[in-house]
UniProtKB/Swiss-Prot annotation:
Pfam families: ArgJ. The active site is at 189 (nucleophile). This is Glutamate N-acetyltransferase. Catalyzes the transfer of the acetyl group from N(2)-acetylornithine to glutamate, forming N-acetylglutamate and L-ornithine. Substrate binds at residues 150, 176, 189, 271, 403, 408. It comes from the Archaea. One of its GO terms (cellular component) is cytoplasm. PANTHER family: ARGININE BIOSYNTHESIS BIFUNCTIONAL PROTEIN ARGJ, ARGININE BIOSYNTHESIS BIFUNCTIONAL PROTEIN ARGJ, MITOCHONDRIAL.
Amino acid sequence: MAENFVVVDGGVVAPKGFKANGHKDRKYGAALIYSETDAVAAGVFTTNKVFAHPVALSKDVLVNNSVFRAIVANSGNANCFTKGGMDDAKLLVKKAAELLNIPENQVLSASTGVIGRRMPMDIITTEVERAFENMSSENSNKNASAAIMTTDAFPKTIAVEFEVNGKSVRIGGIAKGAGMIAPNMLHATMLGFITTDIEISKEDLTNSLQKATDESFNNAVVDGDMSTNDTVYVLANAQSGVKYIDCKDKFDSALAYVSKELAKMIVSDGEGAKKLIEATVYGAETKEDAKKASMSIIRSLLLKTAVFGADPNWGRIAAAVGYSGAEMDMSNFDIIISDISLEKQAILVKSGEQIADCGTPELKLAEEIMKEDKIKIIVDLKMGSFENTAFGCDLGYDYVRINSEYTT
């Protein structure tokens, strides 16, 4: 049980009226997500000024259309910064629309992979055809998730369910991402595709997605690089018979949870990563300060390597907060290293005073905690009432190996 909803199986096909499938042959893959009835859609995208052709195409489609039925995505090629890239993006959409027998302007698209290389459209369209062949497969959600992987080590998927007046509402999602993760999506490569059977307006869905994204994907950092292709979509087809207006808080909470869990899976799968890091900053003067400080901790390469080496070098945490731009008083703040369940907590700095030093019980406890797969860093700035949690991972030898071998 998570708050007022439960986790269920099925990912993007858990909500009523959705089908999906994917196929991947070595380097290249494709995934399809399809609503059997008309749906509304919302999307958020990278703010990188160098952006991929499917980002440009789908932004335009979202603005100019109100009915959507499908998402098509390919892996192995980012379709970014290439001559003819927009034609290739449109051809990908056309192929999906033809197979699903729907208008092209009802299809959203996304790509992930190598930047600056022309799309091998004969291979990509063949993968779309293979994905379409078995949209009712028992493994359809898993296939779709696996098809969009590049350097990912595992598929990322989740679904939740909650009840409203005796009726069930479901939200399901898949995502990919392992490197180039430092999204900042408003209106890595990180892709997220979410489905729901709630009845909701485009405006409300957009607002809910933007809030969920800001709490989740925009708080996730693997290596600090912002991709040209970062994209998150939500399709809502109203098949549950439940209206958003009757469960606004429940839906927003559930969508935020799904988004956060997908974000955590992404950073847990950071290229070569072994450990998940959560950094929570309390007591900030503003929400912006809380985010600055927590993201600064997660972005710190020195902190990431310290976590990799299980070294509770809390000075790197203090330094990261200090240069973050957040208001703070170095004579009055706390630093704690904890396990993810908060059962074990090592207080390293209390009210600006050093507690942990060589040989102290606090430092020994911190060393023990740092050996775990998931750790939490807590900072209390004691300046106000705002807080934020950011997600990241350690940085080790394999990150260099993977990225030195992967053509970008």
